[in-house]
């Protein structure tokens, strides 16, 4: 819990610094430092054995000054009030790519890996019923997150449509294509990270082709990312999952590993010759991509990182102390709120398509995504260079400005 409180505290600290650089006073910071709304719900679910189990769920809505809140729903045993910090990050992501949203986030304390598909369905529907008064296509729009997918979004949409007199596909994003989902949504987060890597590489006169890349994490985002980079000619010299890491200085066969990973992204347990996560971060490489969990790069290991570029595909993988160490060493650090903004961007595209009834091809979606992210990268990189600040602070300045200005015009602070 202390680690998660540190995530909240460090996020608030950077937001405060960003707002002061923008000229906003402490009154505006007090408005923005925590979610406007935070709902805790209890969800009774009939299990397959006939017993009733009650689950705890959350939904945080950080700020809706700009527009509806937007953010994922995660099913995980460790879900708690961390969703408050995650909702703040969603506000930043939406501001960075100029979306008409504030940030939201939700979750249920559960382990779907230990539940039947019918139990997961009943839990998903129960969650929607419990939060139905504060969500909707013009209020708060959920999406997939950790251990949730398009099928769970479909159940949630169906449950909401039974309570609402109108058919509202725009209530939720990340749906199956046949129910109004967008082309390219399932790979959008990984593609967004690839675009961030491409742009960072350009700033260091590199290309993805031939670059030696290490990826921590081989789940949905990490595996899609590895495949994209591998197909572009990158040499993936290291990957990891929850059980260990694999290393080959000549490059791993990503297609071979993808064929053998299980549904939870595990593959290293099939090999005897593995290395630790600590050793993974110390590998000789050009680009390091932490795509797993928070607080992986700290002041204890930041000096050992050999990569010239670090691109954060996970939420909060680098501590503030490590950020300073890497920046002082000249490492180009692309922050999570920029690098992982691809998912919410294509979720926005899905919402727009639902509202208009006009649907785009995957090529159109990817082209619009690239346009958004390249523009955001340029803005943040140039701001960091002009003000001589790290890219994380620059991203927070860009990300929070829209919400703070909207709140000021509304007379909220």
Name each model feature, range by range.
Residues 2-6, 200-201, 304-413:
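Adenosine-phosphate binding glycine-rich loop
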Residues 2-42:
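Short, Gly/Pro- and small/polar-rich lid/capping loops
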Residues 41-51, 55-112:
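Glycine-rich, N-terminal phosphate-binding loop and its surrounding beta-alpha-beta segment
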Residues 85, 139-143, 166-171, 238-241, ...:
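General beta-strand structural signal in soluble alpha/beta enzymes
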Residues 95-209:
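Glycine/serine-rich phosphate-binding loop and adjoining beta1-alpha1 elements at the start
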Residues 181-282:
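Glycine-rich phosphate/diphosphate-binding loop of Rossmann-like nucleotide-binding domains
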Residues 244-333:
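Rossmann-like adenosine-cofactor binding region
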């Amino acid at each position: 819990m202390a680690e998660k409180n540190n995530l909240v505290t460090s996020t608030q600290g950077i937001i405060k610094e960003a707002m002061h650089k923008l000229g906003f006073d402490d009154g505006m910071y007090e408005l923005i430092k925590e979610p406007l709304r935070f709902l805790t719900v209890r969800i009774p679910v009939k299990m397959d054995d006939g017993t009733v189990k009650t689950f705890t769920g959350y939904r945080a809505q950080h700020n809706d000054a700009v527009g509806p809140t937007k953010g994922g729903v995660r099913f995980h045993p460790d879900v708690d009030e961390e969703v408050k910090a995650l909702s703040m990050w969603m506000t930043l992501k939406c501001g960075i790519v100029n979306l008409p949203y504030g940030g939201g986030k939700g979750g249920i304390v559960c382990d779907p890996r230990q539940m039947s598909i019918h139990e997961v369905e009943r839990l998903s529907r129960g969650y929607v019923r419990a939060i139905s008064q504060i969500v909707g296509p013009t209020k708060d729009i959920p999406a997939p997150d950790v251990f949730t997918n398009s099928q769970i979004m479909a159940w949630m949409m169906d449950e909401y449509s039974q309570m609402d007199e109108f058919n509202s596909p725009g209530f939720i994003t990340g749906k199956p294509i046949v129910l109004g989902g967008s082309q390219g949504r399932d790979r959008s987060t990984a593609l967004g990270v690839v675009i961030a890597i491409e742009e960072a590489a350009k700033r260091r006169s590199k290309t993805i082709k031939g670059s030696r890349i290490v990826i921590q994490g081989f789940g949905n985002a990490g595996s899609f990312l590895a495949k994209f980079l591998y197909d572009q000619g990158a040499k993936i010299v290291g990957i990891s999952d929850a059980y260990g890491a694999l290393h080959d200085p000549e490059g791993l066969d990503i297609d071979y590993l993808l064929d053998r990973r299980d549904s939870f992204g595990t593959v290293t347990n099939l090999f005897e010759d593995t290395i630790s996560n600590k050793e993974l971060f110390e590998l000789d490489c050009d680009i390091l991509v932490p795509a797993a969990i928070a607080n992986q790069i700290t002041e204890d290991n930041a000096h050992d990182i050999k990569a010239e570029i670090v691109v954060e595909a996970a939420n909060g993988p680098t501590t503030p102390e490590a950020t300073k160490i890497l920046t002082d060493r000249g490492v180009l650090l692309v922050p999570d709120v920029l690098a992982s903004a691809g998912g919410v961007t294509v979720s926005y595209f899905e919402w727009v398509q639902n509202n208009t009834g006009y649907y785009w091809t995957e090529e159109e979606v990817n082209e619009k995504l690239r346009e958004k992210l390249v523009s955001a990268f340029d803005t943040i990189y140039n701001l960091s260079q002009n003000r001589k600040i790290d890219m994380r602070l620059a991203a927070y300045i860009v990300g929070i400005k829209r919400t703070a200005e909207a709140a000021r015009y509304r007379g909220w602070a």
